[in-house]
A protein has these predicted regions:
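Short, well-ordered loop/turn elements at secondary-structure boundaries
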Residues: 36, 48, 145-148
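A short, flexible beta-alpha/helix-coil linker loop
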Residues: 23-24, 57-62, 158-159
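Pocket-edge positions in alpha/beta enzyme catalytic cores
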Residues: 64-68, 98, 169
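N-terminal [4Fe-4S]-dependent radical SAM core
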Residues: 3-40, 85
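Canonical Radical SAM [4Fe-4S] cluster-binding loop centered on the CxxxCxxC motif
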Residues: 40-71
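Radical SAM/AdoMet-radical enzyme domain recognition
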Residues: 73, 77-93, 102-183
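Short acidic donor-binding/metal-coordinating loop in glycosyltransferase active sites
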Residues: 43, 96-97
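Long, contiguous hydrophobic alpha-helical segments, chiefly transmembrane helices and signal peptides
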Residues: 38-44, 55-56, 129, 154, ...
Length: 183
């Protein structure tokens, strides 16, 4: 009770709070046009590995497994274009989980993004982060043509990688992905 009375007295004497030196800038800040230049699309809420350290917990992120629909991704790209102002270069990162588990939607969204470039005077830079398990010749050809960057996940030499990045059944993934990465 004594502490509450003391706090009330300090508040009444205007000595409890310091002056907000940033308050005068709030009006200008709120009036600024917000420009969005990049999006990270959580395209796959699922994964085909069971990495020991993964924050996503096999792609589940403490939730049920799911894949982003084309419609949701399309709305995201529309949002990016609508809120990019005069910025020409826009970035979209396909992330997960494992984005290649939703490959058709990735391809469709890249095609949709490309269709927006000329009419809106925009240029998309696409990036994809993958563990490499699902890579094949068709996917690699598309990635080489359409992606500005491809992030390949590997944890070091075979013993380390296989211990840290196993399949759900426990077997290592190194021997499957390294030849694909080398290709």
């Amino acid at each position: 009770r004594e502490a509450v009375e003391e706090i009330l007295e300090l508040a009444q004497d205007n000595v409890l709070f310091t002056e907000d030196i940033y308050e005068k800038y709030i009006g200008n800040f709120k009036q600024r046009q917000t420009v969005v230049k990049a999006l990270c699309l959580h395209i796959a809420h699922d994964c085909n590995l069971a990495c020991q350290y993964c924050f996503a917990e096999e792609g589940e992120y403490h939730g049920r497994r799911a894949l982003m629909s084309f419609e949701v991704g399309k709305k995201a790209l529309d949002f990016l274009v609508a809120n990019s102002g005069s910025r020409v270069n826009l970035e979209v990162d396909f992330f997960g989980g494992e984005p290649l588990m939703n490959w058709q939607v990735v391809k469709d969204l890249v095609a949709y993004g490309r269709s927006l470039e000329e009419p809106h005077n925009k240029k998309f830079r696409f990036t994809l982060t993958t563990n490499g398990v699902l890579l094949n010749d068709e996917i690699m050809e598309f990635l080489n043509k359409e992606m500005s960057n491809v992030v390949l996940s590997i944890d070091g030499r075979k013993e380390v990688h296989d211990r840290m990045r196993p399949f759900r059944g426990g077997q290592g993934s190194y021997d499957l992905i390294v030849p694909k990465f080398q290709k």
